[in-house]
Amino acid sequence: MATVDAILAAKYPAKAHARRVAERLQPHQDGRPGIIYLEAQKTRLIEDNDEPVPFRQRRPFFYLSGCLLPDSSLVYDITEDKLTLFIPPVDPEDVIWSGLPLSTDEALQQYDVDRVSITTEVNSTLASIASAHGGRAVAYNIADQVSPETKFDGFSEINKSVLKGAIEQSRVVKDEYEIALIRKANDISTKAHVAAIKASIIAENEREIEGAFIATCIANGAREQAYHPIVACGENGATLHYGRNSDALIDPVTKKKKRNVLIDAGGEYRTYCSDITRVFPLGGGFTTETRQIYEIVLQMQVECIEMLRDGVQWEEVHAHAHHVAIRGLLELGILRGSEDEIFEKRVSVAFFPHGLGHYLGMDTHDTGGNPNYADKDTMFRYLRVRGRLPAGSVITVEPGIYFCRFIIEPYLKSSESSKYIDTDVLERYWSVGGVRIEDNVLVTKDGYDNLTTTPKTVEEIESLAA
């Protein structure tokens, strides 16, 4: 089996991706020739400033090119199976400041394309293709992602409605190269999570832990973060997407360290994401209450990962996580009553309000999940993926139990749900905040491959935090 670095030494498989997308467009062509036209993100300046806006390549363009250059474009002639990349011409003034850019010859060696030209040749190339196909060809592009100066004269139709969806559905199933990129992002992020946990031993503020994570990512080749890191100490962990990352780790009243830290963070490697969450104690060991909740959440995750395989119904996996949570909270005495009744009444949503996971790829919340945020069933409303998981998809498995007053208190005020919650026992757990454990898992034909190797057993975590 080839190593990650050996796989990534080859070119990004842009041509294979173009063919995959073209297959999805075939029903819309009615037997006519067709082309795909995509543009890269433009260079833009910050308002009232001469500094550029931080660059993030358009994902549809990257998927069919592997190219991170701004102001570029591509044309894929579906009939001729010919992929052409257009890169900006040399700007002598820019060379003074930034050096010589990539040449067309260098780009041809670097990217999986058939031809490289400069962007001033886009319109003449499009006209030539349209003429070669006798004016019958369809031009597929994405609405609001085409420059005004780009012309599609001579094409029988300009279709702006189907390409985006075709690319998004194609992205669900990853190839070997994409899996290697996600695995690489995970490997780097594992080092960063370990560094962050170790930094907490002497840290005094959440931002120091965040800094250790980001610095380790950059040092290992992941210059960008897949998303803004979440570093939440104490009760901050009850906020799902807490982002302030600036609280002191010492409680101002007790003058003692808060119980634990939830860190949800992932580096991005060559546009592909990782998304990993861990919870660790401040002061070496988990408190009794935090450890109890941690072990329930870990059991939720372990059992759900074991259910993964080609064709598994994601809603069933999510529901199973709730059953494990209910059993654990019943054992602790936080919940009371029957497991089935608590499940049917959706009381566990008070403690586990979000979906079990989402697709992962070039976006943290990757495309193709078909969520239904209008679902009236609170247990499934925030599930970002619906339906069966195909082999080759990468999904996060991130169960959690949270003690968020804003979410739980309405359940305590409701006669329908309050009878299932023991408030005296619950009182001991507010300071736990929240526990979430998240891994990135590849679905295979007969099972799964967990791409995340970050330590997560109680013993492993406590050893790092001591």
Swiss-Prot record:
Question: Which Pfam families does this chain map to?
Answer: AMP_N, Peptidase_M24
Which BP terms does GO give this entry? proteolysis
On cofactor binding, the record's note says:
Binds 2 manganese ions per subunit.
Q: What is its EC number?
A: 3.4.11.9
- CDD domains the record matches: Prolidase
Q: Which family does it belong to?
A: Belongs to the peptidase M24B family.
Q: Which gene encodes it?
A: pepP
Which catalysed reactions does the entry list for this protein?
Release of any N-terminal amino acid, including proline, that is linked to proline, even from a dipeptide or tripeptide
Its name, as the record gives it, is Probable Xaa-Pro aminopeptidase pepP
> Origin organism of this chain?
Aspergillus clavatus (strain ATCC 1007 / CBS 513.65 / DSM 816 / NCTC 3887 / NRRL 1 / QM 1276 / 107)
Q: Do you know which InterPro entries this protein is assigned to? A: Aminopep_P_N, Creatin/AminoP/Spt16_N, Creatinase/aminopeptidase-like, Pept_M24, X-Pro_dipept-like
Q: Which UniProt keywords apply?
A: Aminopeptidase, Hydrolase, Manganese, Metal-binding, Metalloprotease, Protease
- Summarize where Mn(2+) 2 binds, as residue positions: 264, 275, 438
- Name any cofactors this protein relies on: Mn(2+)
Q: What class of enzyme is it?
A: hydrolase
**Where, by residue number, does Mn(2+) 1 bind?**
275, 398, 438
Q: Which GO terms describe its molecular function?
A: manganese ion binding; metalloaminopeptidase activity
> Could you tell me the superkingdom of the organism this chain comes from?
Eukaryota
> What is this protein's function?
Catalyzes the removal of a penultimate prolyl residue from the N-termini of peptides.
